[in-house]
From Swiss-Prot:
Assigned keywords, A-Z: Acetylation, Amino-acid biosynthesis, Asparagine biosynthesis, ATP-binding, Glutamine amidotransferase, Ligase, Nucleotide-binding, Phosphoprotein
GO cellular component: cytosol
Protein name: Asparagine synthetase [glutamine-hydrolyzing]
Catalytic activity, reaction form: L-aspartate + L-glutamine + ATP + H2O = L-asparagine + L-glutamate + AMP + diphosphate + H(+)
Pfam families: Asn_synthase, GATase_7
GO biological process: amino acid metabolic process; asparagine biosynthetic process; cellular response to glucose starvation; cellular response to hormone stimulus; L-asparagine biosynthetic process; liver development; negative regulation of apoptotic process; positive regulation of mitotic cell cycle
Residues the UniProt record annotates as site (Important for beta-aspartyl-AMP intermediate formation): E365
Binding residues for L-glutamine: R49, L50, A51, V52, V53, N75, G76, E77, D97
Top-rank EC class of the record's enzyme: ligase
Domain (Asparagine synthetase): residue spans on this chain: 213-536
Residues of the Glutamine amidotransferase type-2 domain: 2-191
GO MF annotation: an example: ATP binding
Length: 561
């Protein structure tokens, strides 16, 4: 996880403007650099580095002798960079995975380049020879990117919105900052005065499409057809490959472990592959919760079963509530379920950074959206409607779960890796017949559970453990995080405030006291930026008024009441 930042055509003092880049210093605690672009006194790059690959030569912007006119600032991991280097016989100057972007661009242009990348990324590529600027982001938006572009051609780009909101520009006192769309790249012309003009925004990949880079993958051949045993075999192959390719790092690997299906599968497969790779350390797994919470108990079972070096982080309701302000500042959103679920992830990331040497952290993010794991999928009117909803959730990941996962870990200088959002694994899963992917026998993610039933990766009670929302599983049924928050906000927001909510917050008006409380905090940090969240995350088909799984009639808990 790194932080990237760039300005083109600034009409204010760059030394003053660069101060805004320090607001994302948490993303790269190992080193930082600011560099002016040759020949353009009002253009510069900023970079905060978390050294994960090639600690000696990995500073950015990346420039190599062969292409002196190319400047690259990127945040991400390109898992197939070595395969592409060997395939096209590129001569590398560094061991940095991102260098492949320069070679591919020189060989085939921006579209072929971005379609060949197997990984997660957000980048700014400058070509001074052809006077072009390119912005790009991975399919699911696992790595964040924000931009501000004024009518007169001032462009500002950053990993997080907080690095842009305080920038000054003569013609636009209030810069419109917006997220760069996942699965897209943008082409901009660079003018002699350093300003830019947008040429085109291109959608280069959809989650259901098999990626172009698949033809160069080293994964073993998949079997054709949709017979259940064939599908299960292919899913195991692709999942194991998704884990394996993400072992690329020079830093210690750890894994978040809630004791739910997704994180448990990741942890078990990860530990197995680390042993095969003969890494010189034990896998550290991390669980958080209040004492005797369902997640802590389940995670302990998994850790004992797989033999990881397990860490349990206990927190109380007061610590959780006190963290809300810094959590919302880090997230840059006021979405209710995102904030709720982020508290535990924020606190455990803080623990990992302070108490361990694990830096690259695996997690199970993306599985619920991909495999129809949310409880409300039981209410889907048809397999086809469930399929549509799954694709919608994946398309909006960058606003919700992926945002949460990135900001809570990056806030503490950690890098998150999410194998369930692997291009090959996800596109194959989405290609399966809709009826194979829906809940079965009252159990969500039935196909995924069935796939690993005979693998001995996990205890049966974990493999078939019902869905538990992370924000609820870290507490208990009797005193859930949901209930704790409702009791707290009842004393912070009164009925009079709620009656005037639509006047105070006309856009995305909060409908609950909890939502009002979060919105107040957000507006304090980011006044006038409510449109960063287009809509609240809510379950479908059930007329819910709150996103908590605790409020659903289908909810089942493995905890003792």
């Amino acid at each position: 996880m790194c932080g990237i930042w760039a300005l083109f055509g600034s009409d204010d003092c760059l030394s003053v403007q660069c101060l805004s880049a320090m607001k994302i210093a948490h993303r790269g605690p190992d080193a930082f650099r600011f560099e002016n672009v040759n020949g353009y006194t009002n253009c510069c790059f900023g970079f905060h580095r978390l050294a994960v690959v090639d600690p000696l030569f990995g500073m950015q912007p990346i420039r190599v002798r062969k292409y002196p006119y190319l400047w690259l600032c990127y945040n991400g991991e390109i898992y197939n960079h070595k395969a592409l280097q060997q395939r096209f016989e590129f001569e590398y100057q560094t061991n940095v995975d991102g260098e492949i972007i320069l070679h591919l661009y020189d060989k085939g242009g921006i579209e072929k380049t971005i379609c060949m990348l197997d990984g997660v990324f957000a980048f700014i590529l400058l070509d001074t020879a052809n006077k072009k600027v390119f912005l790009g982001r991975d399919t699911y938006g696992v790595r964040p990117l924000f931009k501000a572009l004024t009518e007169d051609g001032f462009l500002a780009v950053c990993s997080e919105a907080k690095g842009l909101v305080s920038l000054k520009h003569s013609t636009t006192p209030f810069l419109k900052v917006e997220p760069f769309l996942p699965g897209h790249y943008e082409v901009l012309d660079l003018k002699p005065n350093g300003k830019v003009a947008s040429v085109e925004m291109v959608k280069y990949h959809h989650c259901t499409d098999e990626p172009l880079h698949a033809i160069y993958d080293s994964v073993e051949k998949l079997f054709p057809g949709f017979e259940i045993e064939t599908v299960k075999n292919n899913l195991r192959i692709l999942f194991n490959n998704a884990i394996k390719k993400r072992l690329m790092t020079d830093r210690r690997i750890g894994c978040l472990l809630s004791g739910g299906l997704d994180s448990s599968l990741v942890a078990a497969s990860l530990l197995k592959q680390l042993k095969e790779a003969q890494v010189p350390y034990a896998l550290q797994t991390f669980a958080i919760g209040m004492e005797d919470s369902p997640d802590l108990l389940a995670a302990r079972k998994v850790a004992n079963y797989i033999g990881s070096e397990h860490h349990e982080v206990l927190f109380n309701s007061e610590e959780g509530i006190q963290s809300l302000d810094e959590v919302i500042f880090s997230l840059e959103t006021y979405d209710i379920t995102t904030v709720r679920a982020s508290v535990g992830m924020y606190l455990i990331s803080k623990y990992i950074r302070k108490n361990t040497d694990s830096v690259v952290i695996f997690s199970g993010e993306g599985s619920d959206e991909l495999t129809q794991g949310y409880i409300y999928f039981h209410k889907a009117p048809s397999p086809e409607k469930a399929e549509e909803e799954s694709e919608r959730l994946l398309k909006e990941l960058y606003l919700f779960d992926v945002l949460r996962a990135d900001r809570t870990t990056a806030a503490h200088g950690l890098e998150l890796r999410v194998p369930f959002l692997d291009h090959r694994f996800s596109s194959y899963y989405l290609s399966l017949p809709p009826e194979m992917r829906i809940p079965k026998d009252g159990i969500e993610k039935h196909l995924l559970r069935e796939t690993f039933e005979d693998s001995n990766l996990l205890p049966k009670e974990i493999l078939w453990r019902p869905k538990e929302a992370f924000s609820d599983g870290i507490t208990s049924v009797k005193n859930s995080w949901f209930k704790i928050l409702q009791d707290f906000v009842e004393h912070q927001v009164d009925d009079a405030m709620m009656s005037e909510a639509s006047q105070k917050f006309p856009f995305n008006t909060p409908q609950t006291k909890e939502g009002y409380y979060y919105r107040q905090i957000f507006e304090h940090h980011y006044p006038g930026r409510a449109d960063w969240l287009t809509h609240y995350w809510m379950p479908k088909w059930i007329n819910a008024t709150d996103p908590s799984a605790r409020t659903l009639t289908h909810y089942k808990s493995t905890a003792k009441a």
